[in-house]
Amino acid sequence: MSQEGVELEKSVRRLREKFHGKVSSKKAGTLMRKFGSDHTGVGRSIVYGVKQKDGQELSNDLDTQDPPEDMKQDRDIQAVATSLLPLTEDNLRMFQRAQEDLIPAVDRQFACSSCDHVWWRRVPQRKEVSRCRKCRKRYDPVPSDKMWGVAEFHCPKCRHNFRGWAQMGSRSPCYGCGFPVYPTRILPPRWDRDPDRRSTHTHSCSAEDCYNRREPHVPGTSCAHPKSRKQNHLPKVLHPSNLHISSGSTVATCLSQGGLLEDLDNLILEDLKEEEEEEEEEEEEGGHGE
């Protein structure tokens, strides 16, 4: 696929996500081709159309501006606006965010135990799901209290701030005073790419199997550091994601890597290839039906 095609696909996904998948992929593609992938302008024009058509008192809570004349008069935009009616208390926030060009998203960790594969994705808050690129199964994120990786610590005893490998809920000794500290959060991979931010301390924790164990250790605990996992012949996955149970929405959820380690263009190309393969499989299965 050409770079132009990739940019088009990104804009289609963003437009669809702004309206929670209620705009069809075909209609979104038509609008993005017509208006040069301007998902911001088209999104705001749809909100404007909803406000003009709705006429309820609730529409006063939508702060809109007159869109360009070509968008205001466009029949496809008008049709989409009509299909999204009526305006309700439940969907008002969706329209407000679309007007502000906001797509609330979070960085989440995913882990497939069968493939022993761990990855991070930036996903919409309303649908936190990602597909393992090895087995193609879709997963929910690793629970927040089970995440692992490079963690951020704040020692309550000496006020020292430090970072190191850990799993949420497992204590590590402070590099300043040795006091056992729980991690406050796990940092997405991009935060660890800056060499100036990396710790100069050798990893050490109180887990029983840590390659550089700190005493007294805690029996029955396992170290999250990759070196310990490899040395002990343990899988990379400390806590697996649950398989995602589909709600029926087909909107692709990879919006932006936001500086994470993988390239968004490659991810979209990969998604498109897999979607085409899935469609071919469905057609073949349908062709063999009685």
Swiss-Prot record:
Motif (Nuclear export signal): 261-269
Biased composition (Acidic residues): 272-290
Domain of life: Eukaryota
Matches recorded under InterPro entries: SHFL
GO cellular component, one term: cytosol
GO MF terms held by the record: ribosome binding; RNA binding; sequence-specific mRNA binding
Annotated keywords: Acetylation, Antiviral defense, Cytoplasm, Nucleus, RNA-binding
Chain positions with N-acetylserine modification: S2
Principal location: cytoplasm
Keyword Cytoplasm annotated: yes
GO biological process terms on file: defense response to virus; innate immune response; negative regulation of translational frameshifting; negative regulation of viral genome replication; regulation of translational termination; response to interferon-beta; response to type I interferon; response to type II interferon
UniProt cross-references to Pfam families, sorted A to Z: UPF0515
Region annotation Interaction with PABPC1: where it falls in the sequence: 102-150
Short sequence motif Nuclear localization signal: positions: 121-137
Protein localization: Cytoplasm; Nucleus; Cytoplasm, P-body
Region of interest: Disordered: 49-71, 269-290
Quaternary organization: Interacts with PABPC1. Found in a complex with PABPC1 and LARP1. Interacts with ELAV1, MOV10 and UPF1; the interactions increase in presence of RNA. Binds to ribosomes. Interacts with GSPT1.
Family according to the record: Belongs to the SHFL family.
Function: Inhibits programmed -1 ribosomal frameshifting (-1PRF) of a variety of mRNAs from viruses and cellular genes. Interacts with the -1PRF signal of target mRNA and translating ribosomes and causes premature translation termination at the frameshifting site. May exhibit antiviral activity.
Protein name, UniProt field: Shiftless antiviral inhibitor of ribosomal frameshifting protein homolog
Species of provenance: Bos taurus
Gene: SHFL
